[in-house]
Every structure is written in structure tokens, then in C-alpha cells.
UniProtKB/Swiss-Prot annotation:
Designated name of the protein: Elongation factor Ts
Any one Pfam family match given in the protein's UniProt record, by short name: EF_TS
Family, as annotated: Belongs to the EF-Ts family.
Protein biosynthesis is among the record's keywords: yes
Source organism of this protein record: Microcystis aeruginosa (strain NIES-843 / IAM M-2473)
Primary localization: cytoplasm
Key words of the record: Cytoplasm, Elongation factor, Protein biosynthesis
Annotated segments matching region Involved in Mg(2+) ion dislocation from EF-Tu: 82-85
InterPro entries: EF-Ts_dimer_sf, Transl_elong_EFTs/EF1B, Transl_elong_EFTs/EF1B_dimer, Transl_elong_Ts_CS, UBA-like_sf
Keyword hit for NAD: no
Length: 251
């Protein structure tokens, strides 16, 4: 059996966020292989999450994130089972990561696919069924293609199906499951709201010069009329000088 070092345990914890004992066990089960240990922990995390999913999660915190420039803001509620876990730095970091994820995903509108209203799915199906590239396809093939496209579209609207911005190899759903395995409690994203500065406001088109003049109590300057163009005439050729008259010779 390969000896598991503290450095290996630390590396695995940094990559997965799992607890120290879980990391040590994962490495032991996989002969010190980091990659296999990560897969083992993911499987364990999924199992742990399924077992804890039915538990009531009424504690937690409401996290916020304001993007640089103060043009995008996010509020998100993430729940756990006890306020002991809610106070832990690992949980606070998770909430902040989820808030940043929402800020980075303008198309995301729902926590999970199951939250998306049926009428939206029906509208997507109507759009896809009418596409020209499916016009000559057999009905059974068309249905399969449309189902795949709808599934992809609905996942684009779902937060839990987004690739995690800090690690594209996992989704937000997997991130939560890793946190469940590490913290030992059911953790759920309940709701969120994304704010964009000026969103939904129709901006009035204004004449900038007139606006400045109005603020200064002056009349807006009249536009300068273009000067009329004068057609230039070609210069007339100069008249030839008449030869001087010959004088009479004196006798």
C-alpha cells in the first residue's frame, strides 16, 4: 500500500474542497493517484448529496456581489441546515462564488431546469419545429433533434447546469455536491436576482448641443448653412496685340 503524505492530502483538499479525512481516504483507496482520488470524491459527493437532499435547509445566508464599475449586481440566497455551517468560511466562499457565477451569466434566469415554466419549454419547441433545416426530416428524427436542442436551451437558462467559472470541468451543481460532501450538510441555492444598471429603461434621444444650451439658459445655435457654390468660369484667352502701324518715311 502506497504511503499517503500530508502534501498529497493538502493538494487534494485544494483541488476539491473536501475534508481532510475524506481526502486521505480517497488517496488510500486509489493508491495515492490524485486524478482517481478526485473522481472517487465526486462519486462520494454525489452519493452524499442524494442522501442529504431531503433534509430541511433553512439556515444559510444571502450573499451579494457588485461587479467592477457598479453596473451589475447580484443577490443570492443559499441555504444550509445549521448556522454553524453558515458561519464557516468555506460556506461563505461558496456563496460568493455562486454570486459571481450569476453575475457572469446574463442568460441564466432559473436555479434549475425543473424551475422553468412549461410554457417556455413549449415555446422553444414551437420555434425549433419551425426551423428550415428540419423541414425535410422524418418526424421521428425531427423529434429527437428538437428534444436535444430544447434540452440544451433550457440548460442555458439554468444556474446549476452552468460550467463553474473557476473550474470549467465541473458544473455549479457539482460544486454544490462537493460542498455538501465537505461540510456534511444539505446545501441548496434557493433564489437569486441579477441587476443590470439601466436595464428596461428607454433612453430618450436628445440633441447634445441643445441640451447644453438649455442648461446654460441660452438658445441652441442654429445649424450653419452651407455656403452656395459659385461656378467658376474658365478664363478667356488673352487678345493678341495688334502690330504697331508703320510710320511714313521723311523725304
Amino acid at each position: 500500500m502506497a504511503e499517503i503524505t500530508a502534501q498529497q492530502v493538502k493538494e487534494l483538499r485544494e483541488k476539491t474542497g473536501a475534508g481532510m479525512m475524506d481526502c486521505k481516504r480517497a488517496l488510500t483507496e486509489n493508491a495515492g493517484d490524485i486524478t482517481k482520488a478526485i473522481e472517487w470524491l465526486r462519486q462520494k459527493g454525489i452519493t452524499s448529496a442524494e442522501k442529504k437532499a431531503s433534509r430541511v435547509a433553512a439556515e444559510g445566508m444571502i450573499g451579494s456581489y457588485i461587479h467592477t464599475g457598479s453596473r451589475i449586481g447580484v443577490l443570492v440566497e443559499v441555504n444550509c441546515e445549521t448556522d454553524f455551517v453558515a458561519r464557516r468560511e468555506e460556506f461563505k466562499k461558496l456563496v460568493n462564488d455562486v454570486a459571481m457565477q450569476i453575475a457572469a451569466c446574463p442568460n441564466v434566469e432559473y436555479v434549475k431546469v425543473a424551475d422553468i415554466p412549461a410554457e417556455i419549454a413549449a415555446k422553444e419547441k414551437e420555434i425549433e419545429m419551425g426551423r428550415d433545416d428540419l423541414a425535410n426530416k422524418p418526424d421521428n428524427i425531427k423529434e429527437k433533434i428538437v428534444a436535444g436542442r430544447i434540452e440544451k436551451r433550457l440548460k442555458e437558462l439554468s444556474l446549476l447546469d452552468q460550467p463553474f467559472i473557476r473550474d470549467q470541468n465541473i458544473s455549479i451543481d457539482e460544486l454544490l455536491k462537493q460542498a455538501i460532501a465537505a461540510l456534511g450538510e444539505n446545501i441548496q441555492v434557493r433564489r437569486f436576482q441579477r441587476f443590470v444598471l439601466g436595464e428596461g429603461i428607454e433612453k430618450e434621444e436628445t440633441d447634445f448641443a441643445a441640451e447644453v444650451a438649455a442648461q446654460m439658459g441660452q438658445k441652441a445655435p442654429e445649424p450653419v448653412a452651407a455656403a452656395p457654390q459659385v461656378e467658376e468660369k474658365a478664363p478667356e484667352p488673352a487678345a493678341k496685340d495688334n502690330p504697331p502701324a508703320k510710320g511714313k518715311k521723311k523725304k
